[in-house]
Amino acid sequence: FLPLEDVEAIELRPDVPRLAIEHLGLDDDPRLYIRIGDAVELLPSAEPADLIFVDLYNDLGPAPGHLAWTFLESCQKKLQPNGWLVINQWATDDGKPLGAALLRGLFHRHYWELPVKEGNVILLVPGDLDQALDIDALTARAQALAPRLGYSLEALIKAIRPAT
């Protein structure tokens, strides 16, 4: 659904790529390069990116190193101009992301949150403070994709909120 030239993935758990290939239809695509290891250690050698997804969990729950100021700041600095950092984060009982105070301080409340049913909050962090989230363009793109996806993303887009 995206015109990708190459994708570099850093996965902590070696079984995840194997399971994705065996059960989720992940193809052996020459554009995909998977590195196994801790992103805290491997991020410095990663290429700059237009889009970085961070899943802040290990087998026991939130990974402390991945919810650290220096790591998240390094992720944001790896972004190309107009890039986006997307963080899958646990939600607390009040619906805010775990580490909300750290996130507000680091990103100056310049990010958006998308609460999801599973109890997580997806954070959409722009590469710099001049970037804005264009909801109209996002909605138009989602509407164009809906027939290919077989479902609508409209409810998710409507749930996007400013940083709490």
Locations of regions flagged by a protein language model:
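C-terminal substrate-binding/active-site "lid" region of AdoMet-derived donor-dependent transferases
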Residues: 63, 69-132
